[in-house]
């Protein structure tokens, strides 16, 4: 990339900036959950909605982001994304109640949903095709650093300042990024087809109300009748989308995608798999602080080995899949993650704290292998004309399943514990033990889906070829 003009390199730095902001925010909040609960006068069992409100909003808004960038221009949308994300951060810091915080997190989610996909689109437009992979590697590297710094930085800020600062640090960064975007980024636009607004609204309503219904009376305080009404509305919305998309070439996501068996299996496995693994980033720091009495900073540091294991495994995952095939790798890593989850719970409750970093490192390795395998399996056999739509649907399902996973984790804590779980409670560790056992069971379930994947290792050569072209 050394032969790129200075203006293009600056534009890549802006995109990398956005990737870093978004990825940092996905992990920095987790460590602060117990402190937020204490400050806002809420039970920690209700605080999972702080994560769900953000991730669910990202899932809902993702399908519209690419179309908006093509229609309005990448500079305008990227600038808007940074401004919304920064304003959301400010409102989060100013929140005095849980409901105010949830609304502010949703505003953050709107900005976050546009930031990453529009950033990818920007790179595609400003960089020659032969340098696209190198440019994407450059701009996504800060996105890999964000999850590494997030837990420790969040714990440090909570312990030595207050939880408000995990949001306030976004404000100067966002202001600089917004100004740089206006000054340095060109406003590329493209001719767009008509946006499937009807399909978008049906999917958005279906995803949102079903997630709220799942949270139920424990989190939202809804009556059984209201929950039943939400379920009915959500199911009807999704059924209407299926009818809307049938034989509709302009549908948001074509049903032709599901004619590819590996896509159908991969998407189902990704949805179920990320429900289980989506619980872990929320539950681990909460358990370390409330269940074991760790300080916020110490709990944040404990998350770093998991991220390091994930980053390290990415270097060899291609060879592993090529050697053993998708079916064996996905079944083994799914069951392995369930066992590692049980191992983490056991070592923690036995007080073997010096073993926990190694267990978390192993958890990161297994999880990374499974994620990479699921993503590639889902997309590898799609025809070129459906690849972009399939990738967008996968991205949306990833966010949706993670929000559902965090919701279920909160429900499990509420099911096994009282409304006032705290470090001083004598039953707290028992509550967490039953929750971790249930999580391990849920994490293992997708193995039944992955067992149906054709064990055709010859097709895995496609991953290796893509990997080499990226280097």
From Swiss-Prot:
CDD domains: MFS_LmrB_MDR_like (cd17503). It is a multi-pass membrane protein. Residues 34-48, 98-101, 159-164, 218-224, 284-285, 363-395, 452-471 are cytoplasmic. It holds the Pfam family MFS_1. It is found in: Cell inner membrane. GO terms for molecular function: transmembrane transporter activity. Keywords: Cell inner membrane, Cell membrane, Membrane, Transmembrane, Transmembrane helix, Transport. Residues 1-12, 70-76, 125-137, 186-196, 246-262, 307-341, 417-430 are periplasmic. The keyword Coiled coil does not apply. Its main location: membrane. The chain crosses the membrane at residues 13-33, 49-69, 77-97, 102-124, 138-158, 165-185, 197-217, 225-245, 263-283, 286-306, 342-362, 396-416, 431-451. InterPro entries: EmrB-like (IPR004638), MFS (IPR011701), MFS_dom (IPR020846), MFS_trans_sf (IPR036259), Multi-R_MdtD (IPR023721). It comes from the Bacteria. Belongs to the major facilitator superfamily. TCR/Tet family. This is Putative multidrug resistance protein MdtD. It comes from Shigella flexneri serotype 5b (strain 8401).
């Amino acid at each position: 990339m050394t032969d790129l003009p200075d203006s293009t390199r600056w534009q890549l730095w802006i995109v990398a900036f956005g990737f870093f902001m978004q990825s940092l925010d996905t992990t920095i909040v987790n460590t602060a959950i117990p402190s937020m609960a204490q400050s806002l006068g809420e039970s920690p069992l209700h605080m999972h909605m702080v994560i769900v409100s953000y991730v669910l909003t990202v899932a809902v808004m993702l399908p519209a982001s690419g179309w908006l960038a093509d229609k309005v221009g990448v500079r305008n949308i990227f600038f808007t994304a940074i401004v919304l994300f920064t304003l959301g951060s400010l409102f989060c810091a100013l929140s005095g109640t849980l409901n105010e915080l949830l609304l502010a997190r949703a505003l953050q989610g709107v900005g976050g949903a546009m930031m990453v996909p529009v950033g990818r689109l920007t790179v595609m437009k400003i960089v020659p095709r032969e340098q696209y992979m190198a440019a994407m590697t450059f701009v996504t590297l800060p996105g890999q650093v964000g999850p590494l710094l997030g837990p420790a930085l969040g714990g440090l800020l909570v312990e030595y300042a207050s939880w408000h600062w995990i949001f306030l640090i976004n404000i100067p960064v966002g202001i600089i990024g917004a100004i740089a975007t206006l000054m340095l980024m060109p406003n590329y636009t493209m001719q767009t087809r008509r946006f499937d607004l009807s399909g978008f609204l049906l999917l958005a309503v279906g995803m949102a109300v079903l997630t709220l219904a799942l949270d139920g009376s424990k989190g939202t305080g809804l009556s059984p009748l209201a929950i039943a009404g939400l379920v009915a509305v959500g199911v009807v919305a999704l059924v209407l989308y299926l009818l809307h998309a049938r034989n509709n070439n302009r549908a948001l996501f074509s049903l032709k995608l599901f004619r590819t068996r590996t896509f159908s299996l991969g998407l189902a496995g990704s949805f179920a798999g990320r429900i289980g693994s989506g619980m872990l980033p929320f539950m681990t720091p909460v358990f370390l602080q409330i269940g074991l009495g760790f300080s916020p900073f110490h709990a944040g540091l404990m998350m770093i080995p998991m991220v390091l294991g994930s980053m390290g495994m990415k270097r060899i995952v291609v060879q592993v899949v090529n050697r053993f095939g998708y079916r064996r790798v996905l079944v083994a890593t799914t069951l392995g993650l369930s066992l590692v989850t049980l191992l983490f719970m056991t070592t923690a409750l036995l007080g073997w704290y010096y073993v926990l970093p190694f267990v978390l490192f192993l958890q990161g390795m297994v999880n990374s292998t499974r994620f990479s395998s699921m993503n590639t399996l889902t997309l590898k056999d799609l025809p070129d004309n459906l690849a972009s739509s399939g990738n967008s649907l996968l991205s949306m399902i990833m966010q949706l399943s993670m929000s559902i996973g965090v919701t279920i984790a909160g429900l499990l804590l509420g099911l096994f514990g009282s409304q006032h779980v705290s470090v001083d409670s004598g039953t707290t560790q028992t509550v967490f033990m039953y929750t971790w056992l249930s999580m391990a069971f849920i994490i293992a379930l997708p193995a039944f889906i992955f067992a149906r994947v054709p064990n055709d290792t010859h097709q895995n050569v496609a991953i290796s070829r893509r990997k080499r072209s990226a280097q």
